[in-house]
Amino acid sequence: NRPRLRANSDGVEIRNINGTRFYPWEVIYGMSFPEGSRMARIELPNFEYVPVWAIQSGDKEAAIAATRNFRELEAKYMPLD
């Protein structure tokens, strides 16, 4: 299966090479793409994170578009607290 990131009002589903996991918006602190990193990551509590293999720096414009799309959904659904 190909890596994938899907988000809706309930939360975010991430499929990486090691399986698929769902994270409700309440436990997500946002998405980051650290400088020099190969892929985006979803920030979780306690300084943990999940790599997002579906959004890689080598994909250039597609990665930028996917990150923008995620941030729009994040702004719409992620709790403010």
Predicted regions and their residues:
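Bulky hydrophobic/aromatic packing residues
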Residues: Y23-W25, M39, E74
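Conserved beta-hairpin
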Residues: N1-W25
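Short acidic, Gly/Pro-enriched loop/turn segments at secondary-structure junctions
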Residues: E35-I42
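Generic beta-strand structural signal
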Residues: A7, F33-E35
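A membrane-cytosol interface segment of integral membrane proteins
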Residues: I42-D81
